[in-house]
Design a protein with these regions (language model features):
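Acyltransferase
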Residues: 72-95, 116-127, 151, 155-172
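Short beta-strand->loop structural element characteristic of the AMP-binding/adenylate-forming
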Residues: 194-196
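A short helix-breaking turn/cap at a secondary-structure junction
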Residues: 1-78, 122
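Short, well-ordered beta-strand elements
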Residues: 17, 206-213
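Short hydrophobic alpha-helices that are characteristic scaffold elements of the AMP-binding
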Residues: 187-189
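Short helix-loop capping/hinge segments that flank enzyme active sites or metal/cofactor-binding pockets
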Residues: 54-63, 106-159, 198, 202-209
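Short glycine/threonine-rich loop-to-helix capping motif typified by GTGT followed
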Residues: 73-76, 101-112
């Protein structure tokens, strides 16, 4: 449930646990899932994790372009594919939906603007520290000029995007992506859950992650 969490985007906001291992995440998730009567977007769906799956039966799809064109740390992300392959995981290239999620990403800005509309209307947004062109106060202000027709049309495309991605994911068990890949925006719009796990460190010792969807 998102009850008690500060709203940013009603149709995209999601919460999830953080832990040191996937096993710990699964235990926490098992404890917090399900309706609590305070968030109408929560569905009562089954969840189980026993950690006993045979890796050789798991089909992992990946968008090759994300790995080939990773802006940084390409070697680390390609190494993930090598490790999975060595464990017997079935890797297969997949294509993403035809609809570019970037063209409807403004849905987030519009919904965030609505959530913080009182700040904008009362000029309290001027008290926020960051006031750059891409900072939230200006995002809130600019979003007020987005026509309702465009917002509705964008959500129509979003529905098609959800259908397309759901269809493609039926061909695999898990979709793997890099941090610079399209999955962050894509899953924000489509709602597919993700798990981010560590996959090494950069030259300065900062942790790197890889996303399983």
């Amino acid at each position: 449930s998102r009850h008690g969490v500060m709203v940013l985007s009603w149709s995209m906001d999601k919460i999830g646990p953080m832990a040191r291992s996937v096993e710990d995440l699964a235990l926490i998730f098992q404890a917090i899932i399900g309706p609590d009567g305070k968030d109408r977007t929560v569905f009562d769906l089954p969840f189980s994790y026993d950690g006993q799956s045979d890796l050789k039966t798991i089909r992992v799809g990946y968008y090759k372009k994300s790995f080939d064109e990773a802006r940084r740390h390409k070697d680390k992300y390609l190494a993930v594919l090598d490790v999975l392959s060595s464990l017997g995981v079935k890797l297969q290239e997949i294509e993403l939906p035809e609809i570019d999620p970037e063209i409807i990403s403004f849905i987030l800005n519009v919904e965030a603007s609505a959530a913080f509309d009182e700040l904008t209307r009362t000029n309290q947004d001027e008290l926020m520290v960051r006031q750059g062109q891409d900072a939230w106060p200006n995002v809130f202000r600019q979003a007020r000029f987005v026509p309702a027709v465009e917002y509705i049309q964008a959500n129509r495309l979003r529905s098609l995007l959800i259908e397309q991605l759901t269809s493609k994911l039926k061909e695999i068990d898990v979709y793997l992506d890099t941090p610079s890949g399209p999955s962050l925006l894509l899953t924000n719009l489509t709602g597919q859950p993700t798990v981010v796990v560590p996959c090494g460190f950069d030259d300065k010792g900062h942790p790197l992650g890889i996303t399983f969807i």
